Amino acid sequence: MANLGNAWHIPDNPQPQGQASMRLPLEGIEAGTAVTLSNGNQFQAGGAAGNQTQSGSALLLRKAGDPAFQPLPLQFQLTQGNDKFFFAEVPPNTFQAGDLVQYYFKIGYTDRDTTFLHGTNAQSIATVTESEAQADPFTFAIRFPLQSSGPFLSVNSGPFQGRIFENSGHVAVTGPDLAGRPLGSVVTITPPVVEIGGREFQIGPVVSSTPIANGIEVIQTLGPQQVRAQLTFPSPGVMRYEVVDWGGPLPNRVSISSASDGQEHFYGFGEKFDSLDQAGNVVDILTFDNPGNKGGRAYKVAPWFVSSRGYGLHLDSTARSTFDMRAAARGRYELSSHTSTLRFHLVTGPNLKDVVSNYTGLTGRPPLPPPWAFGPWISSDIWRSGGEVRYAVSKFRERKIPVSAFVFDSPWEVAYNDFTFNEVQFGLDGTFEKQNFIGFAKLADMMTFLQQAGLKVICWMAPFVDVNSINEGVAGQNLGKAQNYDLAAAGNFFVRQSPGGPPLVVPWWKGRGSPVDFTQTAAANWLTAQLRALLKACEVKTKTGTEPAIGGFKTDDGESGNGTNTYIPDTAVYSNGLTGREFVNGYCREYLRTIYSVLGQAGLLFARSGFTGTQAFPGCWAGDNQPNFGTEDGLPTVIVAGLSSAMSGFSIWGHDVGGYLNGNVFSPVSPADLFMRWAQFGCFSPIMQMHRQVNPANLRQYPWGYPQAGESIDQNEALDNYRFYTTLHTRLFPYLYTHAKQSQNTGVPILRPLVMMHQDDPNTFTVDHTYYFGDDLLVAPVIEPKVTQRSLYLPEGTWFDFWTNEQRAGKQNITWNSPVPPSEPKSKIPVFVRSGAIVPLILGDAVETLCDPNYINNAGLTTWDGGLEVSIYPAGNSSFTVFDGTVISCAAGGGLTTVTVNSPSARAFLLRSHAARPVSVRRDGAALNEASSAGAFAAANTGWQFDAALGFVLVKFSHPGGATVTITF
């Protein structure tokens, strides 16, 4: 029997203590890199302790294919506890780029048989037979240099060219740079590295090539095997490299890297809360529900980034990935994923708007949601009775707060998720503000009430069907198995624990349940049939027929886990054959795709989770955050989340105004101050929804729940602030909806980080809390308590203060001071308008809802009649095309301003143009009357007035539709 010593070498292990791994470096080894290889040996205590000798121990290594291994003597390194460690250093340039290095250890003993160590990065195998070690050695690859050289094969697509270098396997894309030089921008990816059976190999030189449609197919070396790969342009501005045949065993991990210096910055990655620029960070690409302080975790992730150099990179993997953006990887970034596939996309620009547009052209763009989605929403963590529903809606209308949607968050069902309204719960009365509000005798009554209040309904849901639900303390709730569970289990509609195993049952925050397998068509059809039945049950009578009151679904969850709960274990199995490990991020995409199909463009989603492609199923929100100004868990982090989401293609995005959680509340500021600042950010967000957990001690789930000393629920500054900003958000609808339509057509998001618009200005590279809202508005939310100033960077251009019309020069840091009352609102944030801008708003502030009047079927509510107020900041020639085809153009020069308005329909117009006082104002050549006073101007249908305080010419007229009206002054 062999008398083996207890020796080991496991490259992945962080040994000896304080050393990152037993092979240093573990990865990224180039020809000029010295490599240290250590072995451990137990020299005392029980078991197979033995005395390893330095003189009899050696490292033996060779280039794969060479006939013999060459020895390097091992040297004593150190002693730790019962273990001694020995090492050898492989000198730089011992091997060359592209070499596969094979090695094993010979361990000499005074009291044991000579022991040989071989294995993989994760496993050490001991034997007394040297030939066994030689046949199955440890390996590492000598990577090719970061920079490519030599001959290459190329594929052209318009102004772009894809390249694969024949002698190394480097992949590159070239195209115009910002200066307009053809092929002036070059991005190079080093030959990919893969792990097969615990050993690392590098895809290498091209053996042969064949032209294919839209590209080339190549055969490349990969250690002992060869792979077949394709280089193509699958969509405009996007180059794809994909291995289509591995020619042998599949990898369990793949990685790619590229040179990167300290001047390169990285954005995107999904919805990041910690920083917009992720340079210097290791980014974990894993969907995860981590309420409060999220650190580097995120609900929405994308194996994708946008570089300040004017390109993007997408690693197309649904598995968990790691993006090292110059953290451990120095002078380069490295992307790796635990997957058996390799496909990545280099996305060209060079303009960053074009990068995001090209990326969404490949992965999906958001269809245009219905108009009501862009009005403010009513929501609360829970509605315990129909009386509370009636109270909330009645008070919003009574207190003159415009709203267009009502969200039923959890619980509203009998059980999670049986998609059946709990009519017992909503039949109950409720007493609020010392007044009783009656419940609803029938579901139809509640839906009709909401419809005629001018509201579309959004229903919360999650992808689990429960075997038991938590007790929410509401009447009529089924705490046991949901009534639809057994049917789904019998149909194999749930994700399974293992191949052929039972349904996966996991603990989640609403009980214990099974996730629906959305990769299975039958399962998806089973669930969507229930949702369509729910829509049918919630139909209401419109002016011309019937329509579901429900217009959307709040699609909660879909992440890989929450806290200590794992929702998608590695061993889970989907009907498409993928495991939980392989599809951990892809699950939410199939979930959201399925639910979006129920309503399509007639509705929308409000999704918490997200992944590459889910931006095509609008919209989404920033999840659960805390009501404070903290840079780890509060309002500032949510702004960052919105901007990183935008760089990842998510355009129809919102957040919980006020912060959702009751934890870490407000300190050290007042509740009202935080709520007002969050509402201001909400106004200049695509979706504006107030939502928070319920606290029985207050009414802070409502905008009137923040009275300060000397104020009442009916009259308080926070309520006035919310009313003003929800009204402004509603009035901004023509501007906002136009940009939502632009997102549908181009993928360019509504929120835009400054760097997206000014990538040639390094001052914008790390700006986290100032952004463009569409093309023309620049917004800087206040992110500190009790302040009336805000420092911000104004990018290049001339800017006008939205509130005062003060003109500011760009490309400088400024300190903005809030205008003093009595101008409304009392509390303001920096908002600037770009010189040359044309900004359409709803005329007047009386609109109560953006729902279609045919749906509402209630003449008592004020809806938009099409009237437009247009703010114009003349600078040369500019124009704005409203979503309905209305074109407003402005030409300014030589002391004359000409505004032309082409509208497809008749409507009232109010033009507000920044200008000096004119001598006259003319419509189509005919002079208009100047109003003698503000009152006279308000009463007139046609005329003009000069606002000397703000420097605006105001012009009112009625447009006949189907014609062009010209205004000159």
Model regions and ranges:
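N-terminal accessory beta-strand-rich subdomains and adjacent acidic, glycine-rich linkers
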Residues: 48-60, 70-78, 85-119, 138-343, ...
